[in-house]
Amino acid sequence: MIVEGTAYWASIKEPNTTYEPMYTINLVVDEETAKDFAARGHGIREMEEGPAVVIKRKVNGPNGMVRKAPRLLDQNKNDVDVLIGNGSTVRVQYSEYDWEWKGKAGKGLDLQAVQIVNLVPYKTGDGDELLDGEEF
């Protein structure tokens, strides 16, 4: 399945390792799409930018399995290696799955591929903006 939206906090080529390592993207979608995901049992994260679906892929699977990174494609479906900045428009390919763990159950979204529709370059907070601008 494929959904289009606006990317925030995307970790596609390198996993986010703040907690358990995983590839992830917060995808801000329109209200109708958010309601559809919620009706299918998926959580919706309310962000300042709008409702978001969190789509992720854990790096480590059962029995020592290591999952590969999702594909990252440009508009022409060529593989690319870029960092996706917040506000980029993307199309995300995912699959839905059910999970059970320690007596709990739910639904998840496996991040399979991301196609960049309109890239906003990723910028680090390295302080260069201060050097380029006006004096203090």
Where are the language model's segments positioned?
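OB-fold ssDNA-binding interfaces and closely related basic DNA-contact patches used
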Residues: M1-P62
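Acidic, gly/ser/pro-rich intrinsically disordered tails
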Residues: M1-I2, V120-F136
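Exposed beta-sheet edge/beta-hairpin loop segments within beta-rich domains
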Residues: R71-V90, Y97-G108
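Beta-strand elements of well-folded, non-transmembrane domains
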Residues: V29-E31, E96-D98, N118
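A short secondary-structure junction signal
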Residues: F37-R40, K102-K107, G125-G127
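OB-fold/S1-family single-stranded nucleic acid-binding modules
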Residues: W101-Y122
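Beta-strand/loop nucleic-acid-binding surfaces
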Residues: V54-D79
